[in-house]
Amino acid sequence: MNSSAKLLKEEILMYLEELSQEMGKENLKGEILVFGGAAMVLAFNSRPSTKDVDALFQPKSKIYELSKRIAERHQLSPDWLNDSVKGFINTDSFNYKLFLRFENIAIYVPDPEYLLAMKSISMRLGIESSDLEDIKFLIEYLKIKKLEDIFNLIKKYYSREQIPMKTYYALEEIFQDILDNNP
């Protein structure tokens, strides 16, 4: 695999298990809370791949160090596992559940409601982004029937000031597309 390739579910799980083994060699235990495309791939099977694993993790510096070793070993991007999502996370306001436990690392995913809210405020537009498809999937997964309910859900986690205008416009368009395709 080269550094620009997408990560398939099986590959992500393999690298996370390898990370767990590396943690065990150092007598450490860790936790990883997965967000973004990796959560969509792992927990929801909504798409086959993602470009990286956006997550919060502990112990942070050790997991970073070990993930870099795995990247070198498998010719992955050095930031295949990263915490760049942290700027969009309000850690006090959402629930998460255990997705998978390896011997030395527990993998968690946020509730789909929070994932929808977070993806909505952090959405990227353009052909390289899967955010619009992820948002549409989560709206349908949660069986949301009214646009107003989506905005109310987002406001449970983020203040009105944190919601970009593009979110309002994009969600209106996504919701209309859902209605048009599911009369």
Where are these regions (language model features)?
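Compositionally biased terminal segments of proteins
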Residues: 1-183
